[in-house]
Amino acid sequence: MRVRGVNIKVLTCWHFIRERYFMTTQEKQKKLSLRPLSPRDPEQPHRAATPLELLFDLIFVVAIAIAGQQLHHAIIENHLWHALPSYLMVFFALWWAWMNFSWFASAYDNDDALYRCLTFVQIVGSLVMAAGIPDVFHSQDFDIIIVGYVIMRLALVTQWLRAAKHDPERRITAYRYAVGIVLVQIGWLVANFAHALSIPLFLLLVVVELFVPIYAEKYSPTPWHPHHIVERYALLTIIVLGESIVGSFNAIRDALAAQSINIPA
């Protein structure tokens, strides 16, 4: 009996091995050259997550782990209700940046050199976000995490502008995404560096962030791949559950270390 998940992993490994060891120099140059960022076929068979997408997820593990550790420390110190809003704010930034990358990749990933470079810019942005997470919990300082978030989002704007150039049918959709994302990033920067970022304003900007895809997709929906999206969400869910398990383990370990347990003979 063939298991679909196993087949996907085998295909992904095969594509990686073929690219690393069996592709000719001419094939590699063609793969890395700039190509039109045309829409992908939403019914493409056997489409799986690419090695670049898996690397992107791996980097996000770092940020999610740091956020989980900070929440864990707050729980140990009986500061749960103080730290929980910070955790939810950080997690939204991580989740929303990841989700926008994944849906765009599902619709337009052409794996050329510029696409890879812009993806690595987003990876750098996620690392900057990860570096700023402790400051959010310790002093409500969002400077670093917002800079990292804006880096990721502006790299995605560049991708949308490429899509607008090469996909005439959805050009207005792509422009709506690009303009909407830029405007919201201006809002984040102004609100934070003017020291006006409160929870109500944060929630307002979140609503605007969520509204951008709704507004953009009304003109002409992007051709995302259903099975590819399902796999991408499954991978992120596994990551989040894994971090929850690690957090539970740390809590149990600290509880056991804080008191001795005597077992009668």
Predicted regions and their residues:
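Multi-pass alpha-helical transmembrane bundle typical of ion/small-solute transporters
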Residues: 14-17, 24-265
